[in-house]
Amino acid sequence: MAAVEAEKVVAELRERCATPASLLRDVAAAMAGEMGAGLEKEGGSRVKMLLSYVDKLPTGREDGLFYGLDLGGTNFRVLKVHLGGSKKHVVNSESREVSIPPHLMSGTSSELFGFIAGELGKFVAEEEEGTDMPNGKKKELGFTFSFPVRQRSVASGTLVKWTKAFSIDDAVGEDVVAELQTAMVKQGLDMHVAALINDAVGTLAGARYYDEDVVAGVIFGTGTNAAYVEKANAIPKWEGELPNSGDMVINMEWGNFYSSHLPVTEYDEALDKESLNPGEQIYEKLTSGMYLGEIVRRVLLKLSLQSGIFGSIDNSKLKTCFHLRTPHISAMHHDETPDLKIVAEKLHQILEITHTSLEIRKMVVEICDIVARRAARLAAAGVAGILMKLGRNGGINNQRSVIAIDGGLFEHYTKFRECLESTLGELLGEEASKSVAVKHANDGSGIGAALIAASQSR
């Protein structure tokens, strides 16, 4: 009886999470439509389509010494990149990761940026001899800042709000570049912030440096976002003179995309309702690493309560939100042992579910597969939407298009990555697929910042 009830839960999940190619094409078309609406006017779409003010991407010919600062969570990274022009590319690079003391994450703006500038100063001071800048030229820094900002130029942006574990009230509404610049002056650090970017723009820049056919940078990690190169004359909301390059990098903020075509289940609806931002970031909640483990946990809880298939267990761990994380479901999903030993271990260690039969473990793997496959297929539909907007989804003009993807989910969850890539091929068709490539762009957010500083270099 328990097995029949359990199978009902899984069958319903399978049906509700189905992503046939026809539905995915509708999702891709909806994404392209929202992109157009967001470019039309401010607030015209749930997808913000923010101007990054980056109109020049690296070409691979840049040379000199450039710095990057990457702040997006409880750690930040500082890095130095020595570029050797088109023949040598990156001659060498060094980086250091620094933990931010917790009290600074809710202190004042000057304390946080003072600490960051101090660490940056130490990093710069430890350089070898012979790396002085020529003719008293200032050192150039690219700043990756992965929090919501409103930009008005390539090197300025006011903080809209903090996310993650930060709550520094006096920084909200302030220009984060000016705050950093002031802190660097106080440290006696002769450095100029050449560009303020986010991790998606950094991924695009880092990949473009090596390959001029890269058209978009996409993040599938804890969260998700995308940035791509748009023709400046295709942005009706652009005010002022068009850039000489004729291009503009758009930071899509596509995590907030929504369409009635998205296959949303009761588990997604409950997760959204209980989240800090109900009704927001629906696409992100279906496709990113922050949420996949949590969706699976909710399914397993229903399975336990409705069918009793796990026996008389204490459901307290199974009832704890975010207790099951995406790396756990990835480990279970990739379990290739004949008796699914890893699945048994994870269920026991994390959820205190013991004595499972092989049939039950297979059911758990199937649930992981349904949730991860839906995420990967919807992720591919988003990428197809960008290609559709750019007219690169298989028209007559089959120029090569490369999508650079970074983020832990894409990098470490093999079945997610493989499913995304094969689904993109399915949506584009055999002919168009020949001219589209997906590349893993490792560490875009760090090195990308330094490379954009180089491409903006005066």
Curated annotation (Swiss-Prot):
Coiled coil: none
GO biological process: glucose 6-phosphate metabolic process; glucose metabolic process; glycolytic process; intracellular glucose homeostasis
Annotated stretches, region: Hexokinase small subdomain: 59-197
UniProtKB keywords: ATP-binding, Glycolysis, Kinase, Nucleotide-binding, Transferase
Catalytic function, reaction form: a D-hexose + ATP = a D-hexose 6-phosphate + ADP + H(+); D-fructose + ATP = D-fructose 6-phosphate + ADP + H(+); D-glucose + ATP = D-glucose 6-phosphate + ADP + H(+)
SUPFAM superfamilies assigned to the protein according to its UniProt record, in alphabetical order: Actin-like ATPase domain
The protein's annotated pathway: Carbohydrate metabolism; hexose metabolism; Carbohydrate degradation; glycolysis; D-glyceraldehyde 3-phosphate and glycerone phosphate from D-glucose: step 1/4
Residues that, per the record, bind D-glucose: 163-164, 198-199, 225, 253, 284
GO CC annotation: cytosol; mitochondrion
Top class in the EC scheme: transferase
Annotated ranges, domain Hexokinase: 4-454
Region (Hexokinase large subdomain): 198-443
Keyword flag Nucleotide-binding: yes
Entries under Gene3D superfamilies matching the protein: 3.30.420.40, 3.40.367.20
Protein's UniProt name: Hexokinase-8
Protein's organism: Oryza sativa subsp. japonica (Rice)
Encoding gene (name): HXK8
